């Protein structure tokens, strides 16, 4: 059962009563009842949070052999900044500023880049006449909290998600891949997810790519999910997901590919929704696709760049 009043979403489940507000305040009220359903006790828990954003960034990027020899694919630059940064700026535009990066291959590159973030975005004076003094000018700060987690070199996508469970906790979270940008309205995506009250919602697009094929019903529920078998004009998985914490129970271990058994099972059980996006989406699996993104950025026509 769901009510919407004064921009507050009230959802009644078999567990706690949950209130969502547009500011990210979550109120959970657990009602303890008598056998006649009279209320004995009410336990209320209030959290003022925004959903955390999980970004998968541990892949090898084998199609970028020249660049990926020295860095993970999410650190390959579009313009002068890594594609990972572009993705984070997208989420930050909508007010989602706490990130969990699932690192793996050359994870130290990601950690070092964030450790030196001010060096990348500010003017620096190195004064060697006064004890190696470093002065940072016009510091450009982001409203971000970033946790980089080493989720293993050969861990599959599901395993990487499972490994960051302790950082997510028992709250819903956002998740996407570290090699694709999109101009999806993330606020509307989250609202869609809350309205349908399923465990998982993914963003789907129509594109001729080698990605997962979705069988989507008229009510936007996903009835089947097949990976790597696309025919022209069929909806595909673009990432940009909203996930409930129950999703962790669908992941067995490090060998679990999230796009295989977990998503197939979610679809079979009616727990996977599709948010249809008609706008821009582009992954970066090849040098040609990187060039597409580079050219859009140079021309000032990058649809994902809203900031």
Regions found by a protein language model. Name each.
Residues 47-117, 148:
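N-terminal glycine-rich phosphate-binding loop and ensuing alpha1 helix
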Residues 110-218:
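Conserved beta-loop-beta/alpha segment of the NTase-like Rossmann-fold superfamily
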Residues 172-174, 181, 185-194, 206-209, ...:
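Catalytic-core segments of class I nucleotidyltransferases/pyrophosphorylases
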């Amino acid at each position: 059962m769901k009510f919407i009043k004064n921009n507050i979403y009230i959802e009644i489940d078999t567990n706690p009563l949950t209130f969502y507000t547009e500011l990210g305040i979550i109120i959970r009220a657990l009602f303890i009842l008598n056998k006649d359903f009279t209320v004995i006790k009410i336990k209320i828990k209030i959290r003022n949070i925004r959903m955390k954003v999980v970004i998968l960034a541990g892949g090898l990027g084998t199609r970028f052999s020249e660049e990926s020899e020295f860095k993970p694919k999410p650190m390959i630059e579009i313009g002068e900044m890594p594609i990972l940064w572009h993705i984070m700026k997208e989420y930050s535009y909508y007010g989602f500023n706490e990130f969990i990066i699932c690192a793996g291959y050359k994870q130290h590159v990601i950690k070092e880049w964030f450790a030196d973030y001010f060096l990348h975005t500010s003017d620096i004076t190195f004064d060697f006449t006064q004890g190696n003094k470093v002065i940072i000018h016009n510091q450009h700060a982001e409203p971000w909290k970033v946790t980089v987690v080493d989720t293993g070199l050969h861990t599959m996508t599901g395993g990487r998600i499972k490994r960051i469970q302790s950082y997510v906790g028992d709250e819903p979270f956002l998740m996407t891949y570290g090699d694709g940008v999109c101009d999806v309205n993330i606020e509307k995506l989250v609202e869609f997810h809350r309205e349908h009250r399923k465990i998982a919602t993914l963003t789907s697009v129509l594109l001729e790519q080698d990605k997962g094929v979705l069988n989507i019903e008229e009510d936007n529920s996903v009835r089947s999910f097949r990976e790597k078998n696309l025919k022209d004009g069929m909806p595909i998985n673009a990432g940009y997901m909203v996930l409930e914490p129950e999703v962790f129970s669908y992941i067995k271990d490090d060998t679990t590919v999230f796009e295989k058994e977990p998503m197939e099972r979610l679809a079979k059980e009616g727990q996977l929704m599709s948010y249809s996006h008609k706008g821009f989406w582009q992954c970066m699996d090849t040098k040609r696709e990187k060039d597409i993104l580079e050219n859009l950025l140079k021309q000032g026509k990058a649809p994902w760049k809203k900031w």
